[in-house]
Amino acid sequence: MGSLEMVPMGAGPPSPGGDPDGDDGGNNSQYPSASGSSGNTPTPPNDEERESNEEPPPPYEDPYWGNGDRHSDYQPLGTQDQSLYLGLQHDGNDGLPPPPYSPRDDSSQHIYEEAGRGSMNPVCLPVIVAPYLFWLAAIAASCFTASVSTVVTATGLALSLLLLAAVASSYAAAQRKLLTPVTVLTAVVFFAICLTWRIEDPPFNSLLFALLAAAGGLQGIYVLVMLVLLILAYRRRWRRLTVCGGIMFLACVLVLIVDAVLQLSPLLGAVTVVSMTLLLLAFVLWLSSPGGLGTLGAALLTLAAALALLASLILGTLNLTTMFLLMLLWTLVVLLICSSCSSCPLTKILLARLFLYALALLLLASALIAGGSILQTNFKSLSSTEFIPNLFCMLLLIVAGILFILAILTEWGSGNRTYGPVFMCLGGLLTMVAGAVWLTVMTNTLLSAWILTAGFLIFLIGFALFGVIRCCRYCCYYCLTLESEERPPTPYRNTV
């Protein structure tokens, strides 16, 4: 029975002259002496001494665990061969192995998350701020034929923006010293325009129109750059000065809109509403994504809408066909150039969705301009019974624009691709309702039909962005039944 006794690990077989139980301390190699000789061996310690002298096990990071000895099966991740993970070099984890017992969920990754999110890239500034030249030129063109009160209000708005720019330049001068001389240039050009306005006759002076557009462009570029730099510098700690500047800016915009409505110029009000709303949209997009696809999206959306508004004012009173074709061609060219320069399939998918959003924006902008034109044409001849349906339809178009803003912010801000298309579909339905009401009361049949068509196209774009499969999954009874059934749990396999 002595041969069946358990032998401690690492101990050799019992010596021939020893006890069968291996307890003879004379020749037992389990307890070598300090001098290395096998003759003078101490007596084996008892249980109490063993427990007191027993060393704790080596830590997990100890090199002993990964040197290929008897514990080599338990090597830590840091000491394993890195060639095992060569297939993970492009998985967004810098080639490191996944942590143990933590499955990777690709759906949790932000699809619009960009690598290297950092500070604002100065190279993108001319691309982003260029649309505002067209916006303010369009507003200036509307003011060119408007009343004196509208011109005075626009002047007050520009002066307020200059004051806000002067305040912002004091904070941004340390980072962007080149923009400080632009303040002086903008002020000189603006007051030169005001002086020319007082001296010359506005309706017959093309030079005045060009100077006014140039002044508006300079103001727009400078003020927006200053605002962005100011908000980027203090977005995490909102100062009282920033809040006051924002309130002043919104108050000036509100005054301009109210003045445009009171002066029986709904077209100017519609242009201003669309311009300022898109300005805010691009501004939020830029803040949420300082570089990369977010900046590209802001640039494309704002440029498309701005050029659409400018084309509608230059090419005629309301030349929707020419405006739509020009903007569609321009957006297609830009997106094709961007997609050809990128080999990433994810980038191409995002650019395709961006093109659909830009197309919906063009349709919505044209519907707003058409609604403003209908309201302006029939404003003087409207009775009290006809005024309420027209005002209701215009409010529906404004709500559709707000829903479009929510769709953009939801998709490009949070990465949620479900609620953005839903908001766009709702905006398209509201636009269709407005066009149907105007078509029912026989108010400018051509423009009403276009608003109805634009709403239908916006709804189709939202449905395409949402996806037919996802719509079936969320709305179909059988898909909901399958989703509600309990599935058997599957064990997790940690395979690399």
Swiss-Prot record:
List membrane-spanning regions.
124-144, 148-168, 178-197, 211-231, 241-261, 267-287, 296-316, 318-338, 354-374, 388-408, 422-442, 449-469
Q: Look up the record and give one Gene Ontology term from the biological process aspect.
A: symbiont-mediated perturbation of host ubiquitin-like protein modification
The record's section on InterPro entries has: Herpes_LMP2 (IPR010881)
Q: Where is the composition biased (Polar residues)?
A: 27-41
Q: What Pfam families does the entry give?
A: Herpes_LMP2 (PF07415)
Alphabetic keyword roster: Host cell membrane, Host cytoplasm, Host membrane, Host-virus interaction, Membrane, Modulation of host E3 ubiquitin ligases by virus, Modulation of host ubiquitin pathway by virus, Phosphoprotein, Transmembrane, Transmembrane helix, Ubl conjugation
Q: Where is this motif: PPxY motif?
A: 97-101
Regions of this protein lying in the Cytoplasmic compartment: 1-123, 169-177, 232-240, 288-295, 339-353, 409-421, 470-496
Residue numbers spanned by region Disordered: 1-108
Q: Name one GO cellular component term.
A: membrane
Phosphotyrosine PTM positions: 112
Extracellular membrane side: 145-147, 198-210, 262-266, 317, 375-387, 443-448
Record PTM text? Can be ubiquitinated by human ITCH and WWP2 on the N-terminus in a lysine-independent manner.
- Protein family membership: Belongs to the herpesviridae LMP-2 family.
Further comment found in the protein's record: In healthy individuals, EBV typically establishes a persistent latent infection in which the virus can be detected in resting, nonproliferating peripheral B-lymphocytes. These latently infected cells express only 2 virally encoded genes, LMP2A and EBNA1.
Name of the featured protein: Latent membrane protein 2
